[in-house]
Amino acid sequence: MSRVVITGLGAVTPLGNDTETFLNGIFNEKMGIKPITKFDASETGITVAGQVDGFDPAQRVGKRDARKMDLFSQYAVDAADQALENAGLKSAEGSENPTTVQDPTRFGVILGNGIGGLTTIQDQVIKMHDKGPQRVSPLFVPESI
């Protein structure tokens, strides 16, 4: 049997956009469910959700790369970056220390997703409906996964 050790954590959640804030929220029994503010939900019959607030993709993902990713992918990249820093495999943003070099056969990352990219899918379907299929982005599929 192989040993498995979790050495780094990262989080982008309704309770906070870093592991410390997230864990403090959990341990202090804070609620991440709040009134929906990201879109008009008045016709859905749903008024609350677990939304991520205060997320700035430019901090870790970068503006250019963020334009090519759905929001859920930006969350994943940010959380993965945090986990690498937490594990000591990457220097913190702005640090003068170089990234630590590791043997790639000695570590890995597990990331799961049920469904994502719905914002990108919705935007492209609306674009196709309103402007025709020629206006759908050729990067539609990669942007949504």
Protein language model regions, located:
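Conserved "HGTGT" condensation-loop signature of ketosynthase/thiolase-family condensing enzymes
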Residues: 1-145
